[in-house]
Amino acid sequence: MKLLLYLFGVTFHSNTVVALELRECSHQLGMSNRKIRDEQISASSSFDLQSTGPQHARAHQESGSGAWCPKNQINSLSKEWLQISFSVDTVITSVETQGRFDDGRGMEYATAFKIQYWRPSLNAWASYKDDFELETIPANNDTEHAIRRHLDRAIIARRIRIVPVSNSTRTVCMRVEVFGCPFDDSLVFYNVDQGDLQSGISYHDFSYDGNLANSPHLTGGIGKLYDGEVGKNNVFVNHHKWVGWRRKRNGNVKLAFEFSELRNISGILIHTSNEFKKSAKAFSSATVLFSINGKDFSDTIVHFNNPEDTESEVPRWIRIPVNNRIAKVAKIRLNFGTDSDWLFISEVNFESNHTNIELLNDDVVIPDSVSYFSVTEHDDGTSMFAFIIFFFMFLIVAVIILTVLYRKREYRVKASSPSPNAKREILLTIDGNTIKHHVSPSTYQMARDNLQNALIEKMPMSPIISDYAEPDISVCSDVTANTPLLYGIDGPYDTQKRSNPLSSMVKYSDYGEVYCTTLPEIARDKLICVSRIGQGEFGEVDLCQLENRKVAVKKLHGISQADEFSFHREIRVLGSLKHPNVVEVVGVCTIQKPILCIMEYMENGDLKSYILKNPTIQTSQCISICTQLAAGLAYLESCNFVHRDIAARNCLVDGEGNVKIADFGMARSLYSQEYYKVEGKFVLPIRWMAWEALLLGKFSTASDVWGFGVTMWEIFSLCSEKPYSDMTDDDVVENLQSMSSTGSLKQVLSRPRMCPSKLYNEQILPCWNYESSRRPSFENVHLHLQSLVHTSPHIHF
């Protein structure tokens, strides 16, 4: 029975990603606000414990004589330290220091310091090193002002020591604050061979904090491969975040990861380079072994082959799928690419969740793939009777599980944070512009990558500003009021209750707080306006510069309190969506009016305009675009979000050729001819709408699939005409009414010339099935499109 309970837990426990997540790990840890208690602060010595003891080392606070002052003067070899102890392992991302001001009487400050840290898994204190392998960190130039230093890599510590140093002997006093967050992951350490040197450049894992001992093998610590930082392009120049190995005699690199608890692992993600022109390809294959105790490894081994990519040299995440393996230790062997002299890795993450070990006895064998049960026969037959009961209970539970999974297929709850993007990219060039092929296993899961959400513009904005449509993703729950949107539909519906299903008031009304997120508050003076992009549903949309990136800024002003509430709900819902093929909300400005929503800027504008400006686009590019959109829509599907207005005009293209799902209030004015005006009140995209959405007001992921079928037709038609271009709006409505009454359309969109017959018949046509349950899921559409990416040059028409 415990094994059954265990199986239940494995089946329904959502996967999380074991990774060092730094985007929201910069909180003040409590020196200034006294969340860190006096008893958690200690020091090697104090000039006077009462007036300059460690309890006075709080930044932005004046107590005692104003700071901690060690008993001895400081030089470059000093060993004085201030120690902060935490109750749990903690991620430290930055340190702030001040001197002793003491209302102007102080004269002492530290010009530099070092960091030492410890946690229970380490045998000794470790020293922090920056990207240049230096331990010394610059500190203060006066006694009053605080200086905050961001660490080049985060450290994981239970105790941290601030060690003041100086080139000349001097008296020093310090106040400090530390920033970071609790360490919630379960990785204890990883073991790996030390990296190699190339022409004096080190590709060592120099931040590794375990047992070094001048050995070529690193054990018992954590370093670059688990610091939340991924490497940049051109590993031979931007080498600081990479660990690199030359091809050895055996041609592989071995890694071992140990967790503090049993984990149910479903995937391993490895960030690797692929600079094949410099003989630094991604790994060609991988082998993974698992153990529940670190000693005995399962005979069931995971083998993974990574297809060689000779098109793109961009670093990428590669996902190794693992079929729910229970393990405390995972050993990974990566084989060098063909004719590759180097292998570079910058980060390793795990898709996994906690396994409740209390359900497992020592004598319960956790199955690798097939479980074998044996029963010892007793004279009284009791054991056989128990076995029969157990067997039938197992069958009943299995049927229940399968039934629930089937029912949850269409009505999934909002997914947990998806895993980092495991995409492969194949660059396709169209008259100097670039679109990316994305080929990724289980892309619908991979929202977190995004991983660093890098949104830096790489191409100048088109001079035709009307081509840019405001990102405003319209999403809505399946649970909608089934009210017809047109007059003349039978049923007891109050016509006064008809409302625009594309408005923010309606489309976000079904989302409770569970779907919302708290977005970063961005200082208004950080935004430098570049130009006006256009007009959105709530106000103007401007192109602005935010530090080193360009962003699209939506303004809200001069509207009702209800619209302001809708705007707040919209941006909070949108902020919860994180996927490489969904336009991202960067932050908000809400402290002053007008309220601003800062969104990712997509410099190549909407997909329809982009395709129209590139008439030489080929079938392979069309398949790539559809694959990317299907990935984003599969993610929305997994979150149970409904878009309601999927069309080429509502997708955007960034400077690198990434195509992303969006929905623009502005698109309805840019492409007003593609919308049908209902009673002079609102407009509907009837040529993209499923029959049940238009006639019954039923919006679901299945109605989105219908719209995506029309969108694929658009893409393969090169957006040269609108759907059903030979029909009036009334004819289109009549066509959908025909499906409602007869189960079939009078007229179906014909296969575009550039669309392969197989794709049209097997992927596009099924999107327009009368029964929504017979339409494919976005997950299945995405998987089928991915399979075509590899064969697109050989597709027959």
UniProtKB/Swiss-Prot annotation:
Phenotype when the gene is knocked out: Viable. Normal morphology of D-type motor neurons, but 24 hours following injury of D-type motor neurons there is reduced axon regeneration. Double knockout with ddr-1 results in a more enhanced axon regeneration defect of D-type motor neurons as compared to the svh-4 and ddr-1 single mutants.
Membrane topology note: Single-pass type I membrane protein
Record InterPro entries: DDR1-2_DS-like, FA58C, Galactose-bd-like_sf, Kinase-like_dom_sf, Prot_kinase_dom, RTK, Ser-Thr/Tyr_kinase_cat_dom, Tyr_kinase_AS
Stretch forming the signal peptide: 1-19
Expression by tissue: Expressed in some neurons in head and tail, some motoneurons in ventral nerve cord, in PVP interneurons, seam cells, rectal gland cells, vulva cells and some non-neuronal cells in the tail. Expressed in D-type motor neurons.
GO BP: any one term: positive regulation of axon regeneration
Transmembrane regions listed in the UniProt entry: 385-405
Keywords: ATP-binding, Cell membrane, Cell projection, Disulfide bond, Glycoprotein, Kinase, Membrane, Neurogenesis, Nucleotide-binding, Receptor, Repeat, Signal, Transferase, Transmembrane, Transmembrane helix, Tyrosine-protein kinase
Reactions that this protein is recorded to catalyse: L-tyrosyl-[protein] + ATP = O-phospho-L-tyrosyl-[protein] + ADP + H(+)
Disulphide bonds in the chain: C25-C181
GO molecular function terms attached to this record: ATP binding; collagen binding; protein tyrosine kinase activity; protein tyrosine kinase collagen receptor activity
Sequence ranges on the Cytoplasmic membrane side: 406-797
Site (May be required for collagen binding): R100
Phenotype when changing R100A: Does not rescue the axon regeneration defect in the svh-4 loss of function mutant (ok564) following injury to D-type motor neurons
Cellular component aspect of the GO annotation: axon; perikaryon; plasma membrane; receptor complex
Glycosylation sites: N141, N167, N264, N353
Membrane-side (Extracellular) residue stretches: 20-384
EC number: 2.7.10.1
Active site: D645 (proton acceptor)
One of the Pfam families matching this protein, by short name: F5_F8_type_C
Physiological role: Tyrosine-protein kinase receptor which, together with ddr-1, is involved in axon guidance to establish the tracts for the ventral and dorsal nerve cords during nervous system development. Acts upstream of the adapter shc-1, and the tyrosine kinase receptors svh-1 and svh-2 to regulate axon regeneration following injury in D-type motor neurons. May mediate axon regeneration in association with the collagen emb-9.
Record protein name field: Discoidin domain-containing receptor tyrosine kinase B
Name of the gene encoding the protein in the UniProt record: ddr-2
